[in-house]
Amino acid sequence: MVRLRETEVILRLCIVFFILLSSCLIGLDSQTKEIAYIHKKVSFRYLLALEAELYINVVVAAYNLVQIGLGWYNVEQKTSNPKWFSYLLDQTAAYVVFAGTSAAAQHSLLVVTGSRELQWMKWCYKFTRFCFQMGSAIILNYIAAALMVLLSSISAFNLFRLYSPKRFFSFKSSS
């Protein structure tokens, strides 16, 4: 049980590291170029999906840090209510990070390929550093989402090991 708890803490720290690194790449990335004698600056604020991803990353990193803190000071709990809450929040965080990252990837693909119908120019021919950093941030977010799926499976194990395999929704100790 101690190894499982250590694994959970290490996973949460890795998730926080990848998410904060991705947030720094998204939030601090901007590039200015002169196009047709006009200075054009591009940043994450022009792509709403990237801005939403930044806010999602901050909330999920804070949640994981709070969970690390609660696990650090909390004694083993015998009831299932906090474990259910942790399981549901871990699931929600994993889904939200994956959905936000997928939306940011789709929006970024529009920036890479452009769209004549929407009159979007291909930014990556002009702003290559910006595009490479956004691509790196999206890859880091997908790694964090995969780690969060693994973490939510550990959370599910911690929850469902409390229940009896023979009686539906009965604790092992009560059977």
UniProtKB/Swiss-Prot annotation:
**Which residues point to the Cytoplasmic side?**
1-7, 73-91, 158-175
* A GO-annotated cellular component: plasma membrane
Ranges that cross the membrane: 8-28, 52-72, 92-112, 137-157
Which keywords describe this protein according to UniProt?
A: Cell membrane, Membrane, Transmembrane, Transmembrane helix
Q: Self-association or partners: how does it assemble? A: Homodimer and heterodimers.
What's the family? Belongs to the Casparian strip membrane proteins (CASP) family.
Name assigned to this protein: CASP-like protein 2C1
Q: Which organism is it from?
A: Arabidopsis lyrata subsp. lyrata
